[in-house]
Structures are given as structure tokens and as C-alpha cells.
Regions:
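Beta-strand-rich N-terminal accessory domains
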Residues: 1-52, 159-185, 242-246
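Surface-exposed coil/turn segments at beta-strand junctions on protein surfaces, enriched
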Residues: 13, 84, 97-99, 164, ...
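Generic structural motif
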Residues: 18-22, 31, 63-68, 73, ...
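Beta-strand-rich recognition/accessory modules
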Residues: 48-49, 83-85, 111, 115, ...
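Extended, loop-rich substrate-binding clefts of extracytoplasmic carbohydrate-active enzymes
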Residues: 50-115
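Extended Gly/Ser/Thr-rich low-complexity repeat segments
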Residues: 90-99, 118-129, 182-187
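Acidic (Asp/Glu-rich), glycine- and aromatic
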Residues: 101-150
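Long, charge-dense
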Residues: 133-135, 143-179, 186, 217-223
Length: 247
């Protein structure tokens, strides 16, 4: 890839859209999800967290090559490939036809039982977000200081969402995948996968002192481990979509 490249979603009812912007960081293709308002002004919302070159099972797939090509009525599709250790990853991303967002189709060819296999994102510090009610603020942090946002369970989908001033960004698991949250500011802190623990505590980012990451894990890998048959190809799918604010 040469410089920044991007993929855009269909246009929302309010005239805005999502943009997936790719940029090279070291040997990895990193991506940021942005909201474009009707005037095409961009607000960066979340970004992928990459691993180190020495990681056999990095936080996100170690994608090193990117090709964006036309794909009929869908507009364009992003095709990415990469490798780490003895494993090979591939990822295709295309705009959703009926929603404002993108579908991610991932695969990994593994030679043995995998460690972590999935994706990780964090909310970009400083992005505009509504203040949370005091009941959802972290201990010792008054609600009026909560000019930030965290991930929380989505009400009607197997995933998590982050609410911003102009709408809601959702990460939703589909085939062979599950979503969960992990706090990088507390040892062993974790929120269980969606639907297993009703009434979960909302994780938030507070003044940069604590952050929660949304992760998509390839649960389809568990079946591969149970059979013990390697090498094997693991596949999983998920969606990142935008729901504009109604106000």
C-alpha cells in the first residue's frame, strides 16, 4: 500500500457515513474507524491495537499487505493478508448493503493449538462523547468529569457498543466469533461475553487512567483444538456498524 487508503460505508439517513482508514505502522496495516459528517469532516472513533513483530498470537491479525478493489454494487472491498510465527491470516472487509458499516470475514491457517486468535480495538482518547450518569461513573470520578466514553453491552445484538455525541458504534459477533471487553487498567479485569452476565458493570475510560478494549475472539478455533487435527483453517465473521443519534 502507498500512504493512507480507505473504505467507506453507505450513506446514513442524516447524510454521514463511516470510513475505515488504513495506514502502515511498522510492518502492520493498522486501521481506524471514523465518522464522516455530511460535510465530510472526520472524527476518529476507535482504532485497532496491533501486536509486536515477535508475537506469535498478536492482539489483532498481523496484516502486512492490503489491496482495495471494486466489487460490483457493494462498491469496494479491502483484502488483507499477513503472517506471524507459523500461522497465516487473511481478512476481507466490505460495506454492508443494508446498514451503515462493514462486515469482516477473517481466516487463519494454524499449524497447532492457537493462543489468542482475534481482534482488539480501543476508543481513541479525546474523541467527543456524552457524559455518563453518575451511577455509571467509576468510583471517585464525578459524572461531570466523564467527558469520555466506554464500551457497553449492546441491548439487541451479541456484541458491544460505544456511544458518541453523534451516534453509536457497535461491534457485533457473527459466525464463529464472540465479543467481550477487557480492561487494560486492572489486573485480570474482564467483562464476560455478551448475554452471559445480565446487568454487567459498564467499563469506561476516565481521564486516561483506565481503558477498556473491545475484543472479538475466534471461538471456531475451540472446535479445532478439540479434534487435535492440524494444520487447520479457522474462520470467523463480525460487523462494525454505526447507528446515528436520533436527536
Amino acid at each position: 500500500m502507498a500512504g493512507d487508503e480507505s473504505l467507506v460505508s453507505r450513506v446514513a439517513d442524516n447524510g454521514g457515513r463511516l470510513r475505515l482508514r488504513f495506514v502502515r505502522l511498522g510492518d502492520r496495516v493498522h486501521h481506524t474507524v471514523e465518522w464522516l459528517d455530511p460535510a465530510m469532516a472526520a472524527t476518529a472513533l476507535i482504532e485497532s491495537r496491533e501486536g509486536q513483530a515477535s508475537d506469535n498470537w498478536p492482539a489483532s491479525p498481523p496484516l502486512q499487505q492490503l489491496l482495495i478493489e471494486p466489487r460490483g454494487a457493494a462498491g469496494h472491498v479491502a483484502l488483507l493478508v499477513g503472517m506471524a510465527g507459523r500461522s497465516h491470516w487473511s481478512l476481507s472487509i466490505e460495506p454492508l448493503a443494508d446498514r451503515v458499516g462493514f462486515r469482516f470475514d477473517a481466516a487463519c491457517r494454524i499449524g497447532g493449538p492457537p493462543g489468542w486468535l482475534g481482534h482488539t480495538w480501543r476508543i481513541i482518547p479525546g474523541c467527543p462523547a456524552p457524559a455518563l450518569p453518575e451511577s455509571q461513573a467509576l468510583p471517585g470520578s464525578p459524572a461531570e468529569e466523564t467527558g469520555v466514553v466506554g464500551f457497553r453491552p449492546a441491548v439487541d445484538a451479541p456484541g458491544y457498543e460505544a456511544r458518541f455525541d453523534s451516534g453509536c458504534l457497535r461491534i457485533v459477533a457473527e459466525d464463529g466469533a464472540e465479543c467481550f471487553l477487557e480492561s487494560s487498567g486492572m489486573a485480570d479485569a474482564r467483562i464476560d461475553p455478551m448475554g452471559e452476565s445480565p446487568g454487567q458493570t459498564v467499563e469506561t475510560i476516565q481521564n486516561g487512567s483506565r481503558s477498556s478494549e473491545c475484543r472479538v475472539r475466534a471461538t471456531s478455533a475451540l472446535a479445532m483444538v478439540a479434534t487435535g487435527r492440524f494444520p487447520a483453517t479457522v474462520q470467523w465473521r463480525f460487523v462494525i456498524e454505526w447507528v446515528p443519534s436520533s436527536t
